[in-house]
Amino acid sequence: MKGRVIVLDHVGDMEAAALLVDGKLDDILIDHSDAPRPGAIFRGICDRPIKGQGGMMLRLPDGETGFLRQGKGLRPGQPLLVQVTGHAEDGKAIPVTDRVLFKSRYAIVTPGKPGINVSRQITDDDKRDAVLGIAHDVFDSAHGLILRSSCETGTADDIAEDIVAMSALADAVLSDAEGKDPEALTEGDGPHALAWREWSRPARVETEAGSFEAMGVLDQLANLEAAHVPLSDGNMFVEPTRALVAVDVNTGNDTSPAAALKANLAAARALPRALRLRGLAGQISVDFVSMSKAHRKQVEQSLRAAFKADPIETSLVGWTPMGLFELQRKRERAPFPIELFRSL
């Protein structure tokens, strides 16, 4: 199977979307948690400041608690619009930000940050001018607007419709900012909406019930239960612990002088996908095969290139004195629900 295929289906009663690239599972989105989705917007009520951290705990609907990292100048009881930025770890508050965005396939509306900006990924000057022209025709707001890279292949009508819809949503939500009680204002996008929003490159779309089984998605999901990840040169094990995600890279049966570098480069290229499919994030520690310091730069360059193409924000922290490489990855997704999947 060649090319890109987006598969929209359900796993049990859970809405799910899969992205296949040349038949290989490249990304998976499953709505398996009752927690607020990333992107959901609430009117929160400031509860108590976190001394020494500068943060603020907020009351959210349904008894949930949010944590705002920058809470300076806020007072208990004050209403505040906040947006969920990721999934909370067990026993911790939901991470939120007061920098609310309204994001769709073609447009992002940014309240409090005026101006119209076009994605740098659109490099053709004529296309940039055309996209800006569409925006100026339909966007008359004090909010800011970012035109996403997907505008390059979108039609003028679709782009204009997206801009108008996001602008109207922003106005509606901001008008409901005041109130004494916490309230859910938007739900955040589910897997099917997220697939439409984020997987914008040309692809065939399958929507028939049972497509996950017919397209081989279920078989590939079953493989995620194993920590073992085969590589073109060697293998690696990706294992989450309570404190961090541990990654161990091995050369396999190859004992040639170049084996270590080949295995490490293969692991660097494969790591974003392995983390993405498993929904793993937080602190990540990679134990590469022992190599010379001269080869470390090559591996680090390969890591940077691989994560640049990954949709989830990841910071490459660097090498530790013991030769491990550390990364910090944003918790945008919950871990893949292998227990739920096993029971189906």
Model-derived segments and their meaning:
Residues 1-35, 40, 89, 97-142, ...:
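Extended, charged alpha/beta regions that create polyanion-binding interfaces
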Residues 3, 63-64, 76-80, 103-106, ...:
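Short glycine-/polar-rich loops that comprise or flank the Walker A/P-loop
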Residues 4-21, 26-29, 35-87, 93:
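S1/OB-fold single-stranded RNA-binding interface
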Residues 36, 40, 68-75, 91-96, ...:
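Ordered, soluble secondary-structure elements with a strong preference for glycine-centered loop motifs
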Residues 54-56, 88-90, 94-96, 100-109, ...:
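Conserved glycine-centered short motifs in functionally critical loops
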Residues 70, 149, 288:
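Short glycine-centered, acidic/aromatic-flanked micro-motifs in structured strand/loop junctions
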Residues 80, 180-183, 198-208, 253-258, ...:
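Long C-terminal interaction/binding lobes of large macromolecular proteins
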